[in-house]
Amino acid sequence: MRVFLLCAYILLLMISQLRAVSFPEDDEPLNTVDYHYSRQYPVFRGRPSGNESQHRLDFQLMLKIRDTLYIAGRDQVYTVNLNEMPKTEVIPSKKLTWRSRQQDRENCAMKGKHKDECHNFIKVFVPRNDEMVFVCGTNAFNPMCRYYRLSTLEYDGEEISGLARCPFDARQTNVALFADGKLYSATVADFLASDAVIYRSMGDGSALRTIKYDSKWIKEPHFLHAIEYGNYVYFFFREIAVEHNNLGKAVYSRVARICKNDMGGSQRVLEKHWTSFLKARLNCSVPGDSFFYFDVLQSITDIIQINGIPTVVGVFTTQLNSIPGSAVCAFSMDDIEKVFKGRFKEQKTPDSVWTAVPEDKVPKPRPGCCAKHGLAEAYKTSIDFPDETLSFIKSHPLMDSAVPPIADEPWFTKTRVRYRLTAIAVDHSAGPYQNYTVIFVGSEAGVVLKVLAKTSPFSLNDSVLLEEIEAYNHAKCNAENEEDKKVISLQLDKNHHALYVAFSSCVIRIPLSRCERYGSCKKSCIASRDPYCGWLSQGSCGRVTPGMLAEGYEQDAEFGNTAHLGDCHEILPTSTTPDYKIFGGPTSGVRWEVQSGESNQMVHMNVLITCVFAAFVLGAFIAGVAVYCYRDMFVRKNRKIHKDAESAQSCTDSSGSFAKLNGLFDSPVKEYQQNIDSPKLYSNLLTSRKELPPNGDTKSMVMDHRGQPPELAALPTPESTPVLHQKTLQAMKSHSEKAHGHGASRKETPQFFPSSPPPHSPLSHGHIPSAIVLPNATHDYNTSFSNSNAHKAEKKLQNIDHPLTKSSSKRDHRRSVDSRNTLNDLLKHLNDPNSNPKAIMGDIQMAHQNLMLDPMGSMSEVPPKVPNREASLYSPPSTLPRNSPTKRVDVPTTPGVPMTSLGRQRGYHKNSSQRHSISAMPKNLNSPNGVLLSRQPSMNHGGYMPTPTGAKVDYIQGTPVSVHLQPSLSRQSSYTSNGTLPRTGLKRTPSLKPDVPPKPSFVPQTPSVRPLNKYTY
């Protein structure tokens, strides 16, 4: 239960974080008004239809004063009566014409300007009072201003200079307004547009301005709007961010304010300059761990009341070199005031970052306050402010904090399109109860978006894109380029339910709603969620107004719930060439589709995101549990398999190796199965030029025609050290023949010699260890432990001795049996204490001549060194030469008895009876090493015996092979033993050595015995 609650808590936390940092998606419009429908709307072009010779409008500004719309353009100002309902074209009622003089146009051309620029573009149109209007124009790059009467548009008074009141170029932005009888303007004050200024003129008092060429005050600004609120005048603009210069050139949106009663500074500081100028950043961004900013202010409204709060609403875009993106943000005037009461920002050195100024360093009275108000109430005018206050505000005009948007997020965003939003108009009292806020936003592509805004942070619904209107009329506006499609300004005429959309070459009048498009389909009317539309009692969809409350209507702008409504079966006529003569006809240009059953069912985005995320987490958890369980079962199964395999292999290897290594202590001869695989014999100690077979099987190997090297016979394996107990010759013969028959019949299976005991057979007490012949680096041989190599060796011998007959094979077999019989007789006589050594040597001489090995010199291959084996089986390296004969060691039979050191006895040959002989089985008797060592009685304790010079041809599986007598090592019993030799130790007898120069005659008579745990020589 605790785990479940913990998971639920984590899930809710992640959902809340996801909602907080998720980037808002673009909403699809509920309805779309395409060009075929919108081109019926009336258009104002500034010239009568058919008069194409007249210049285009060159729209500059648009202002609504009471029931008249003033449209200013190039050389002219038009008035439009809003009470008239135009049909296809908007006709101006009056026109003001103000053209530049010829001299001014010539001077403009002399300054290098194009003739199309050398005209009078009206940039300022500000009412001074109810009767007079202040008008300024560029006047061919020589700005001038005039007063006109509003009623008649007649010129009244004299021309005054437009410097610092009107820009020189029509492409430069500017704002102006009258407050308390004074003109506040913001523009550029020179021909090169390098001196940006916020300027106050006219009225009583001296003119004031911002500091010239001071980037801390303003830097390359674009002024957009100015409003009067309380004791201040607010300017909204965008500029190059001076606090961002160290990180690159970026544009920030600003709001600046000045006191209306500002009189400038003293003669020492800020004389004829603003003493109350402060500015702050407008922050329109998507919240999250890393904010996404819309920094470029494009347009902003006047102060409007939204939910009883004085608010300004602006449209912001991303940087010009960034991805296209736009947002609509609202700012409370209270939040703006709060920021101006906050901390200041400063840069201590030109290369340092901007930081906040501590409050204790802010002088009194607080900079930015208005004289006779608030903290500066004691001062009559700003001229009386202390120099410290004036100096501080001169160098610290920027506030540290930025103005946050209402609800800390944009009301609406548009980021999945290639165009940016450029203009805005807001109806803050839409709907029959005037409780909805509808935003109209223009764009660069000539598209107007109609948005039902989410104005409350506690609302369950986000903003909804109601309509997407393609407003630009290609046929009537005569666009010269794509820039002409940009919406420059929007003017709302709520009283006449119209929106005027201004382009550079025309102004189009668009109704605020298109309720007639839904006809008699109630479901479509309700699902539109348009505050201007409702289902009327007459059974049709129409526009609702506050005066229609008593008549009754049905509307659901909050949710658009149509679940209780049936489908619309009426299909409105579709016309590809609609009749646009009837304005607003219910069927003109409408393309309609039959509504499906639940097509208008809307699911809130937060609910959808929550459900999808919960399903994903649940699925991931289930999948993780399943994978974990399966993996755990699989790992356990593999461990069990590997454990069983290792146990079986360990048992097999250990038992087999034990049996093989204990082949020195073999029990009586038995016959065993031939299909049992033999484990690998010391594969880690001996190296070969051929790799072992993958299965590790070791089969019988046959000596090549040059003779099997004795090194392979050195391995202490049962095959190389047979033990033959005292038995009858007939019994031994039968066993040998039976073993030989099995070896000949099955060559591909592992072979066991009759002398080898089973892997787990107990050792016999009468067992006598045989001698071990160890490898020498001088011997050449070709060793292979693989079945394939043994098979190839056998085939090679058979191919070489191909002409031999079957009789030779039988003869070889008889000779092998005779050799075994001779060996048995020898052992029998050795165990007899009354036997005659000379008689025995006579028998040995006969058997000795039957088994001979090739000399070492006939070997052609170089054997690999086996240093590890020598180090492990011998004592530390001796001083014997590399070509010394084979070494031998005597292995004690009983582990519990301390081992004796092996004595090396050298001396001159005493007599021929001391000659050492070797008994070996033929190589075809399933021996992997090709050499078997025998046990022989010892006839003396030292001395060398001469190497016989005779050589004899022996047979290997019916093949005659010339072998020669080789020096060898053997274990020999002492004549002092009775019956079986005691298991306390063995004495070493001299080995057969090659002829070497004589050594000193002094040799020890008995070997020294040391209780060591390793063998020495």
Curated annotation (Swiss-Prot):
Residues 628-1017 are cytoplasmic. It is a single-pass type I membrane protein. CDD domains: Sema_6D. The chain crosses the membrane at residues 607-627. Residues 1-20 form the signal peptide. The modification Phosphoserine is found at S667, S678, S688, S875, S901, S927. GO terms for biological process: axon guidance; neural crest cell migration; positive regulation of cell migration; semaphorin-plexin signaling pathway; T cell activation via T cell receptor contact with antigen bound to MHC molecule on antigen presenting cell. Keywords: Cell membrane, Developmental protein, Differentiation, Disulfide bond, Glycoprotein, Membrane, Neurogenesis, Phosphoprotein, Signal, Transmembrane, Transmembrane helix. Disulfide bonds join C108-C118, C136-C145, C259-C370, C284-C329, C477-C506, C515-C533, C521-C568, C525-C541. PROSITE patterns: SEMA. Residues 514-569 form the PSI domain. InterPro entries: Plexin_repeat, PSI, Semap_dom, Semap_dom_sf, Semaphorin, WD40/YVTN_repeat-like_dom_sf. Residues 27-512 form the Sema domain. Residues 875-886, 965-981 have a biased composition (Polar residues). Residues 688-719, 731-769, 783-818, 873-912, 965-1017 are annotated as: Disordered. Residues 21-606 are extracellular. Residues 734-749 have a biased composition (Basic and acidic residues). GO terms for cellular component: plasma membrane. It is found in: Cell membrane. GO terms for molecular function: chemorepellent activity; receptor ligand activity; semaphorin receptor binding. The modification Phosphothreonine is found at T717. Shows growth cone collapsing activity on dorsal root ganglion (DRG) neurons in vitro. May be a stop signal for the DRG neurons in their target areas, and possibly also for other neurons. May also be involved in the maintenance and remodeling of neuronal connections. Ligand of TREM2 with PLXNA1 as coreceptor in dendritic cells, plays a role in the generation of immune responses and skeletal homeostasis. Belongs to the semaphorin family. This is Semaphorin-6D. It comes from Pongo abelii (Sumatran orangutan).
